[in-house]
Amino acid sequence: MNFNKKTIEDIQVKGKKVLVRCDFNVPLKDGVITDENRLNGALPTIKYLVENGAKVILCSHMGKPKGEPKPELSLAPVAKRLSELLGKEIKFAPDNTVVGENAKAAVAEMKDGDVVLLENTRYRKEETKNGEEFSKELASLAEIFVNDAFGTAHRAHCSTVGVTDYIDTAVCGYLIQKELKFLGNAVETPEKPFVAILGGAKVSDKIAVINNLLDKVDTIIIGGGMAYTFLKAQGYEIGTSLVEEDRLDYAKEMIAKAEEKSVKFLLPVDHRVAAEFKDVEATVTNDQNIPTGNMGLDIGPKTETVYANAIKDAKTVIWNGPMGVFEFENFNKGTIAVAKAMADSNATTIIGGGDSAAAVNILGFGDKMTHISTGGGASLEFLEGKVLPGISALND
């Protein structure tokens, strides 16, 4: 995939109508936005366009309204809060058809530097099917398309891909530019030693990532529920821990492949365990084996040291997926240890979105990381080496 895409700075935007696909899929509680990270992430691109005299038309999805208007998933609260953050009025066009009379009238009245926000693009059934009609309607509003929603870049929808069939100038905003710079460089030209840390519950979710990264990394660190499938494949006792029986052969194969490529494949050497899936006091095992009747819920203290040392020696580190059941206070120690080791390191540190991003932010290490990806599924597909339709649709 080509990572050198044209950006907003490569084109003339003054006086032009610019449709910007943002990611405003934010959590709401009683109409109030509870996490503003994505709004703040969109500001640099919006500010640049406003300051350079563009007529800025913003669009985004929120939640899964399943192709029909749901008042609780309206973007009205986003328009209100974004206006405050931007320090400038954003006109909201409340059309259930997204591109309706309100939107057309609002866009027709725009002056240079004005901002309009359209309604939730997923109010339209065709959005997720990349339907031609809705793509044309969105495109009819603008002369330039800017994609700045990395979180949906792996989806071929009307507002991410379809519009580019009808608008010739399609470029990326600052957010996608940053994702391409850090994730793209890490995957294609990382500074070595390159360490990938993979956690989370299932091996099956990370198969393609491990496959792709084995050709690029020096060390792979495995934690979370997926570690027990690898340990069982090597003959260790795992008690009642999570295991994917149908992936044991694959796990053996991966370990052999890593050895063949001289990639260090680090698995836990001890665990924090409990008799049931509850936030109870942890018992620490002596070694890789987990006693009968117990389940592994986090990596142990010896493992933390081994993993921290591997991170300390790295020049590039990518992390995707927690080391244990992070929601339980007794079993979040491994995740904290990895986050701390990354925060203390001099390497380029990249958090691959999703749970790891949430963990790092909750722990207060967010500002110590080089880059925290804004895409969960998109980051994973990127690390799998897949072409992301929302990126490939933009001008080279």
UniProtKB/Swiss-Prot annotation:
Q: Tell me its family.
A: Belongs to the phosphoglycerate kinase family.
Q: Which reaction does it catalyse?
A: (2R)-3-phosphoglycerate + ATP = (2R)-3-phospho-glyceroyl phosphate + ADP
Q: Which UniProt keyword terms apply here?
A: ATP-binding, Cytoplasm, Glycolysis, Kinase, Nucleotide-binding, Transferase
Subcellular localization is given as:
Cytoplasm
Cite the annotated pathway.
Carbohydrate degradation; glycolysis; pyruvate from D-glyceraldehyde 3-phosphate: step 2/5
Gene Ontology molecular-function annotations:
ADP binding; ATP binding; phosphoglycerate kinase activity
Q: Which InterPro entries match?
A: Phosphoglycerate_kinase, Phosphoglycerate_kinase_CS, Phosphoglycerate_kinase_N, Phosphoglycerate_kinase_sf
The UniProt annotation places substrate binding at: D23, F24, N25, R38, H61, M62, G63, K64, R122, R155
Q: Which gene encodes it?
A: pgk
| GO BP, one annotated term | gluconeogenesis
Its recorded name reads Phosphoglycerate kinase
Tell me the subunit arrangement: Monomer.
Which organism was this protein described from? Clostridium botulinum (strain Eklund 17B / Type B)
